[in-house]
A protein has these predicted regions:
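Divalent-cation-assisted or electrostatically stabilized phosphate/pyrophosphate-binding catalytic cores
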Residues: 323-329
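Metal-cofactor-binding active-site regions of metalloenzymes
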Residues: 2-289, 341-343, 347-359, 363-467
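C-terminal amphipathic alpha-helical interaction region
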Residues: 293-295
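Short glycine/proline- and charge-enriched loop/turn segments
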Residues: 308-316
Length: 467
């Protein structure tokens, strides 16, 4: 019987072990998409206890705790820190086979040096040991990043953000590069005209100009885009239900925008036309700046209306959607390609039914200018687990070039999430190692396969994003 989480965890062949230990393990981390708040990094924040660094804002854990019958007061409520942690430890034991079980123990082992299994009987001991370590300089925010060999982190930032904390980080002694990434979702969220107009007021202030018409809107966003570029931004990110590619005229978009400015309710058709125009304009900006654009699509948000009213967004009530994607995605990319403004792009689907659909569509738009120009992104969110990542890499291998893949990202809000890169690398090495052992890949090419592992773990991302 193998030991849990030993040095060969997930590595089920000698070749897999060789690939991981000799090639993957040593590579630095490029975390090109996450949801870290830059303020704690800038301040080199010292976390008070495990719930603050581990449970706060982690809707993965919150969903599991709710499913285990834990009352909300222990999750997002005001119960004492240890009582919240105790409920998490109780729930974790029931979460076997959920990726949370592996992630939790990897984080305890790699960051805190604790190899005990977390359960109700060990909860107090682990809590006390981790909390004591969190009070030391080695566990401040910046120290954790450096200790985990993190070379680059890209945060997720709204166009109105002043990026002052990124400036503060650059001026610090932190070796890790912390760069902004452009996330302009609110600039196209015209479906709620009251909220949208409130946002435009903030955008006017950030861009130092009035926004009276659609051209003003694009000019204001371009000013902010240029500012982000001056601060080292190399990526954009867009959270969308599907790809908006409805036909429209400039006159229609102007009329829709002015109608929204007058706070008149828009039709579904008008909303989709406006979204289509905005998604196109964002893509043009990215292409002209030689950025990489990312598209996370397919989530239905805030499904539980009662809890959304109580807790707000990003609290564990989102799900996999089933919107049509094939035709609008092809229209969207084809227009950009015809106009010569199709930037390097990464696509993340939330519905696994789309794996092959997405791969075959985006690979219709590789143009020979850049290796791996159109990227099929790593398994995202609900697919960020062994089977989801294997399916993503299998679809990428079956229909494209796994060797050109830019690899893993945490997509996380937690400073303890970096072992997910290790998790991914072990899964990658296990896939390749198994196929060498089974004679599906030549053992004589093991040197190249080792280089391939290093590329997917680090080199491809470094070159693709020009970090």
């Amino acid at each position: 019987m193998k030991s849990f989480l030993d040095s060969n965890f997930l590595l089920q062949s000698e070749t897999a072990q060789k690939l991981y230990h000799e090639h993957a393990a040593k590579m630095p981390i490029i975390d090109y998409h996450c949801h870290f708040i830059p303020h704690p990094i800038a301040d080199n924040y010292q976390f008070a206890d495990l719930p603050e660094i581990w449970l706060r804002g982690d809707h993965y854990k919150w969903r599991a705790m709710r499913a285990n019958g834990v009352p909300e007061t222990y999750i997002t409520g005001d119960k004492p820190a240890y009582e919240k942690f105790e409920k998490w430890a109780e729930s974790l034991q029931y979460a076997m086979r959920n990726p949370l079980y592996h992630w939790t123990h990897l984080e305890l082992s790699r960051i805190f040096g604790i190899d005990k299994v977390l359960n109700p009987s060990t909860a107090r001991e682990i809590y006390d040991e981790c909390t004591a370590k969190l009070q030391t300089p080695e566990f401040r925010a910046q120290a954790i990043m450096e200790r985990m060999n993190v070379e680059v982190v890209c945060t997720t930032d709204d166009p109105i953000d002043d990026l002052k904390y990124h400036t503060q980080i650059r001026q610090s002694s932190l070796k890790t590069k912390v760069l902004p990434a452009w996330r302009p979702d609110k600039a196209m969220a015209i479906e709620n005209v009251d909220t949208y107009n409130e946002y435009l007021t903030k955008l006017e202030a950030a861009a130092d100009m009035s926004i009276l018409n659609f051209k003003n809107l694009i000019d204001a966003l371009q000013k902010r885009h240029d500012f982000f570029a001056s601060q080292g931004c190399r990526l954009s990110d867009h959270g969308i239900l599907t790809f908006y590619a409805e036909p429209y005229t400039d006159a229609e978009i102007e009329a829709i925008f002015l109608k929204a400015r007058m706070k008149k309710e828009l039709t579904v058709e008008e909303i989709d036309k406006f979204r289509s125009a905005m998604l196109y304009e964002f893509a043009v900006m990215d292409a002209k700046s030689d950025w990489v654009q990312q598209f996370h699509y397919g989530a239905t948000r805030n499904n539980n209306v009662r809890m959304f009213k109580q807790l707000g967004p990003d609290t564990g009530y989102d799900a996999i959607g089933d919107a049509e994607v094939a035709a609008p995605l092809a229209r969207f990319l084809s227009r950009l390609d015809e106009e010569g403004v199709l930037a390097k792009s990464i696509f993340y689907n939330l519905n696994p039914r789309d794996n092959e659909l997405l791969m075959t569509t985006i690979y219709s738009f590789n143009d020979g200018t850049v290796p791996g120009k159109m990227q099929y992104g790593s398994g995202w969110w609900f697919l960020d687990q062994i089977h989801g990542m294997e399916k993503q890499m299998n679809a990428l291998s079956d229909l494209g070039l796994l060797s050109r893949f830019v690899g893993m990202l945490t997509d996380s809000r937690s400073f303890l999430s970096y072992p997910r890169h290790e998790y991914f690398r072990r899964i990658l090495c296990n896939i390749l190692g198994r196929e060498v052992e089974d004679g599906l890949l030549p053992a004589s090419e093991l040197s190249f396969i080792g280089k391939m592992v290093e590329d997917i773990s680090y080199n491809n991302a470094k070159g693709y994003f020009k970090f």
